[in-house]
Amino acid sequence: MAGLRIEYKDPRGLNPRARNPRIHSAKQVRQIAASIAQFGFVSPILVDSTDGIIAGHGRVAAAKLLGMCDIPTVQVDHLSPAQIRAYVIADNKLAENAGWDRNLLALELQELSVELHFDVAVTGFETGEIDILIGELGQTEPEAADNVPEIDRSKPAISRLGDLWRIGEHVLFCGDALDKISYRSVLGSKKAQMIFTDPPYNVPVAGHVSGKGKVKHREFAMASGEMTSADFTKFLKATFDRLEACSIDGSIHFICMDWRHMGEVLAAATSYSELKNLCVWAKTNAGMGSLYRSQHELVFVLKSGKAPHINNVELGRFGRNRTNIWSYAGVNTFGKDRDAELAMHPTVKPLNLVADAILDCSKRGGIVLDSFAGSGTTLIAAEKTGRRGFGIELDPYYVDTIIRRFAEAYEIGAVHTQTGQTFEQMSAKQLTLKGARGEKEKEKKSKSKIKIRKIKRTSKAKATNGRPQRRKGR
């Protein structure tokens, strides 16, 4: 056999085999095209002396899809027509006879999903399949991932309105979910791939969320029972408009709500293209209630835009079987972490509930946005699932809580983007300033006491015309 020589040819001049038994779907051709766009055309097409394709029909179709004019080819002229026909079959079938070491494959995919700055699905594996493979590694999730530091409101918060924090691959902004500036600050020109958010339910925390136990929460900054039905609908509508404007076409939005306000959510969601489903979080224990104690919450699954939505479930194709009944324990379940979870936020959602929703409708490395970040469960779930969590939270104390939660669970520190300082540095600075203010206050009080004593002595002297008083009985 003579030495092989690469020759570049126009793919439109190459002739597909009339009896090629290998079928390439349009989806697979798009996948091959994505691979070529990412890695280049690194595998030449095998052709015969008449430019008939021997191996590489899918790559030729992908090259045409990409509009390529020159692709590498190698002419095979040492095989008989019968041998060529046999090789066409062997080239495809022999590759199918190989297997995968699923553990090593999962490790490679897991590391690549962190290292690469593009969709790891370019490897040919679907996102849902990759998530399942990585999940099979059986890595132990840090216990602290479900725990949240208790908020101490007796001390001033470190964060302030307008602060933008970067926490590893995640971004957190302290601001109003109704303000355009908040979204510009946290996202810039990027768009979210998926939304998971838990707006306030427009019910008072006292009597509905916080009962007569030792854990008491202050009311939310907004929509904590003070709004009429019309006002709350307007509030939700404004929120949804902001979320739709900053998410990709075809994105899925998971909106949490209680049964009292189903009507307002549906009335506010008219701009969404579709209500995909209504999921029910079925808790293991009942909470508060009047006639019936509440043992569920609702998650509205809304679609924004007309483009195909991301579906990693695919009716259990890769072993991911999901229904619209989500069974997870609530914080009212008696357990070792119950008090800590209750203390961190009045309406905290289970980490796995949010993580599973993220796995359903987003890709690895994609942006998941939460405009009511609360205790940060969505951002923590994004870290757990290999996504990027972007959050907006109005309450500075909760912003601090999210930052501390990342530090405790994953040892990921936060950097204040406006100053470049870490959260620890800003905390230490606040303590230093507080100490300095305390010393000044002590000095001020000391001077004030000295001044008062001087005034008393002066007043006493004036009362006796400047003469010392004689002691009685002398």
Residue ranges and their predicted role:
Residues A145-D146, I358, V415, K429, ...:
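Intrinsic disorder/low-complexity segments
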Residues Y8-D10, D152, P204, T422-Q425, ...:
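Short, solvent-exposed coil/turn linker segments
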Residues A2-V399, K445, K472-R474:
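Core catalytic lobe of class I
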Residues E443-R474:
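Intrinsically disordered, Lys/Arg-rich low-complexity segments
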Residues L161-S185, I403-K442:
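S-adenosyl-L-methionine
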